[in-house]
Curated annotation (Swiss-Prot):
The name this protein goes by in its record: DNA mismatch repair protein MutL
Organism: Borrelia duttonii (strain Ly)
Stored SMART domains: DNA_mis_repair, MutL_C
Gene Ontology CC terms, in alphabetical order: mismatch repair complex
Protein's GO biological process: mismatch repair
Amino acid sequence: MNKIKFLDKTLVQKIAAGEAIDRPCSILRELLDNAIDSGADKIEVFIEEGGIRRILITDNGSGISKEDLKICYLPHTTSKINEEKDLERIQTLGFRGEALSSIAICSNLMITSSTTGENSYQIEIENGIEKYFKKQSAINGTMVDVTNLFHNFPARKRFLKKDSIETKMCLKVFEEKAVTHPGIDFKLSVNKELKKVYFKESLADRVQSVYGEIIENNKFGKIEAEYDHVKMKIFFAPPNFSRKDRRNIKIFVNRRPIEEKSLSESIINGHSRILTYKNFPVCYLFLEIDTTHVDFNIHPQKKEVRFFNLPFLPKQISNNINEFFDREKQEILQDYHNVIIKRQLTNDAHLLHPENDLTNSNFKTYEITQDEALILDKPKNNKVTNIIEDKVKFEGQIPQKYKPSFKQHIQKIFIKTSKMPNNFQKSTQTNEFKYMGQLFSEFLIVENANEIYFIDQHALHEKIIYQTLINSEKTIQKLLVPIEFQVECEDTDKILTSELEEYKKIDIIVKKIQNQTYRLESIPNICNKYENIIIQFFKTRKSKIIDSLETELYATLACRQAIKCNDTISLEFSQFLINEFFNLKLKHCPHGRKIYHKITKFELEKSVNRQ
């Protein structure tokens, strides 16, 4: 007796439907694709009970003729492709001819449609079988009404989430379609309540309309680029709106949302200079790619894609984002006046190493004034009290001579303190800013017009040092004794091997000796004594872009040398930090953290019911 049998036609259709339609949002996606492909410029969506009870979509597109309406719900019927070659140049969102047949087999489906100048016709299908076909009062376009989803798929229905969760999934699909088609009016109603309305607008405005709430209606940054076969637009949020997961990294290829790890990683890499580890950007990537260089016929829901002859794409995305932030940084730094600082850091690069014995250096011992003593590490018997009655009061003993550590030398590089009078005002005017004092030995309080700034002293000092380091001139320095090291991960080995030439651009010479074994031969002069940091970076390489090494290294140096929390600092040094903060318009430390928090007078008064 034969064990292999032909499956019943209805069973085959149910299996196929289960692949294409897994929940209400899948139906919404397919029906929106059809409405968009019809040329509609107005689409309305109605959802009830998460789409399980009902999904109704109306559009003003080209409509479906009487003859086509009779067969449109049958398996593998489509108007979008005719032959095999059409799969190589897909111009529409749908093309397989599976959507309506899959929907019809797992729900009650009613379609009403008309073409221009013709009568409307209506067809109802239940469990994949036509229930009736009749003439209907005229409408403009098409109306698709799906009810009782999975009523004949009890197993599938049991795995659906609560109505509220299914509604959120439908909303996500609706937003993805709306943001990729800004030339269409979209409306969404949930349980008879109007939820979303988007009118025709530019892509930039549509991104702002759909996703602006995520960044509290701040403006997205924008990048546009064009290459052979590819047009690229990138919209990204300010760094302080970063997230702890990747959910707000969205990629659209030819107006389809896709899941592509290499492109997602390239976006993360592009933000690696400004975001801390495990913080992810809010970013939306739109790619328009020649249809001969992309294949969507992979995933049942078209979530995956293959690219042909576009190896440059991931790296170009990273580079574009990096260049954007570099340009932004240069605009800020063009007013950077402290050229002497950069020259001194360049000439005395060896001083960037705490391992150096400064006793044997060319630096002399320093006479310590009261204000300088506040910058230095305080001996145990030195006590400094808070500002009291508009005066600084010192208690205990201050050493008269002190040999500065590397940390203090860095501070002297950034500000030359002078003798401070015994008495000074509690609130000291700095240009148009008023310095109010230090809070918790961690924050600088500054009044500016009708605003109060709480500035993180460590983050601010770190950013100032970092900008000086990153912009100082560097030369390549050959190691007297090259260092050999091994990487354990094969993926890391492949990455390093492919990027050896790229490292030379940042003055790092590393050569591969054998499989997973390398030799570090040269580094930038400013990185002397920090070979271990570079090697550790090599060993932990995953997919970061090459120039993140420079950024990460100097960010680490700056972090180590900046003043810390619980460091009490002088009035002059505080003034210096505040002036740099406002002059350079600094917002984030090299690791992406906010440097300050601001409260307006209005907000403060409102908090105590003064408004």
